[in-house]
Amino acid sequence: MLGSLAKWLRIFGFDTFYPDATTNDDEVLHIAKAENRLLLSRDKELIIRGKKAQLQVLEIQTTDLDTQLAQVLTHILIDHTQVLTRCTLCNTPLISVEKKAIKTHVPPKVFETRDSFWYCSVCHKYYWMGTHYENMIEKINKLTNKNNR
C-alpha cells in the first residue's frame, strides 16, 4: 500500500485520492479515468490494466518513501504555492482560520507561540506551523533539490 506516499503527496499540495480497503481495482480505475488522475501503484496487474484503459500510470518501484517521492517528482512538478494546503488525512483543501477562533482547539503552548492556523472542514483537524511543519519543509526542500540536480 502507498498510504505514506499519498500523505506526502498531499503535503506537497497534490490532490491525492487514496482508496480505502473496501475499494476494488475496478473502482480505482474508474475514478482514475473519470477524474483524469495519474495512477500510482506497486501492483503490476493494476498498472497493466491502467495502461490498457489508456490511463496515465506510474509503477512505484520501491517501498522506501523517500525513493518513492523522488520517483514521483521526476514525473510531476510541485506547485510551491500549493504545499501544505491539503488535509493529510482526507485530502480536503485547508481553510485559513483566525487565531482567536481556535483558542480552545489547540494546545495552550501552540496558541501562545503560533500565529497562523488552518482547518479541515471534513476531519475537523487543525494545522499550524510548528516543528512538524518545519520538518516537512526541510524534507520537501531536500527532495526537490535532489531532483533538480
Question: Which residues fall in each region the model found?
Answer:
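Long, charged N-terminal interaction/targeting segments
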Residues: 1-82
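Short hydrophobic-aromatic micro-motifs
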Residues: 40-41, 119-120, 127-128
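Short cysteine-rich clusters marking metal-coordination/redox-active sites
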Residues: 87-90, 120-123
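Short functional micro-motifs and their immediate structural scaffolds
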Residues: 92-98, 128
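Short cysteine/histidine-rich metal-coordination sites, predominantly Zn2+-binding motifs
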Residues: 101-112, 135-146
